[in-house]
Amino acid sequence: MSRISKSEMSRLLSVYFIMGSNNCTKDPLQVLREALEGGITIFQFREKGEGALTEEKRICFAKELQAICKEYGVPFIVNDDVELALELDADGVHVGQDDEGITSVREKMGDKIVGVSTHTIEEARWAIENGADYLGVGPIFPTSTKKDTKAVQGTKGLAHFREQGITIPIVGIGGISIENTASVIEAGADGVSVISAISLAESAYESTKRLVEEVSNSL
């Protein structure tokens, strides 16, 4: 197995759904299934914060979500937990700046997908040099889902990464909705990552379909 190509990674980032059990008011397994039917291209398991599952329940829930992703042939990424990603044989892992360092993550994950959240050009260059396959850049807009977010960057912050010669695939993160998706793609992102735009939507399926349309119309 070799590392994922840049073009394939870019394609997979189009509509990147992130979810944990505490991000939904409906059955999360049904929400994920609807999102997959609607056309999400990659999924990240992020079981964190108030009311999140722990220990064995967390692992069992992750396995259920992973099995659904497999049915649809969509990559299953684990947030922040390299050991869990390895235990599940997940397709990859996504780490932040305060998590395990990219060098040791890449070493442990082999050729699997490794994504890194970055907020500065320096962080981006370090991540690229040490084996990141894609960057999560943000928060682009204010968000209520994450309590520990950095300063909002806006689409200008995202465009700055491209202006500084960062060519690796980028997914925009933070406060992204159907209404502002086009501006994120136009600023230079390959895709958008969302939590509540799908997880709290009246119809996860319809919301995902609209996100897919917005991205494809803007690329």
Curated annotation (Swiss-Prot):
Entry superkingdom: Bacteria
Binding, 2-[(2R,5Z)-2-carboxy-4-methylthiazol-5(2H)-ylidene]ethyl phosphate: 143-145, 175, 195-196
One term of GO molecular function: thiamine-phosphate diphosphorylase activity
One record GO biological process: thiamine diphosphate biosynthetic process
EC assignment: 2.5.1.3
Keyword Transmembrane helix among UniProt keywords: no
InterPro entries from the UniProt entry: Aldolase_TIM, ThiamineP_synth_sf, ThiamineP_synth_TenI, TMP_synthase
Catalytic activity: 2-[(2R,5Z)-2-carboxy-4-methylthiazol-5(2H)-ylidene]ethyl phosphate + 4-amino-2-methyl-5-(diphosphooxymethyl)pyrimidine + 2 H(+) = thiamine phosphate + CO2 + diphosphate; 2-(2-carboxy-4-methylthiazol-5-yl)ethyl phosphate + 4-amino-2-methyl-5-(diphosphooxymethyl)pyrimidine + 2 H(+) = thiamine phosphate + CO2 + diphosphate; 4-methyl-5-(2-phosphooxyethyl)-thiazole + 4-amino-2-methyl-5-(diphosphooxymethyl)pyrimidine + H(+) = thiamine phosphate + diphosphate
Family: Belongs to the thiamine-phosphate synthase family.
Listed name of the protein: Thiamine-phosphate synthase
Species this chain originates from: Bacillus cereus (strain AH187)
Gene this chain is encoded by: thiE
